[in-house]
Amino acid sequence: GRVEPEEIVKLYIEKGYDGIVVTDHYSPMTFEPNWCPQKQIDFYLSGYRRMKAEAEKSGKDFTVLLGMELRHYGTANDYLIYGIDEGFLYSAGNLMKPWEKKMYSLCHSKGFLVFQAHPFRTGIRRCDEHYIDGIEIYNGKTNEKLNKKAEVWARESGKLMCSGSDFHTKAHTARGG
């Protein structure tokens, strides 16, 4: 992102939020190619850890939860994963390798939820709905028409629904609902 993690916590507290789920990108573009898995996870968790520390320091009742926006190799699709923890990340290996069916099975074996993020953006393909629990029906950086299409798909398929700001700059603050 383009905003320091500590500043993100302050922005959301100012907007009256009680918490945030940090779903940083975990994709082939996130890491240097020569990084070992340990270094990748340390890097991936750094923003979350800084946000969690800032929330504790603030003295406010503000919860910071760990999530993930996962992209597999060779695709533009993004998947939001809720419920993950640090131990899982260090033990799971390279999460960009397993595709939808295998990833869904792995996540469900741990009690995590998998949502397709912004499914109607250009370049994204709608995934097999058997391998997701839900659909992001509102994305703060996606136009209203495409968000509405996502909501219709979620309702028709009986999937859970979520909303996100897709925070990358201060202008995206609190745009997720």
Put a short name on every predicted segment:
Residues 2, 110, 115-127, 143-145:
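Active-site-proximal loop/helix segments of hydrolase catalytic cores
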Residues 67-69, 117, 164:
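Conserved beta-strand termini and adjacent loop/short-helix elements that scaffold enzyme active sites
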Residues 93-121:
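Internal catalytic-core helix/loop-beta-alpha segment
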Residues 120, 160-170:
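Acidic, metal-binding active-site segment of PIN/NYN-like and related structure-specific nucleases
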Residues 174-177:
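Short, intrinsically disordered, charge-balanced linker/junction segments flanking boundaries
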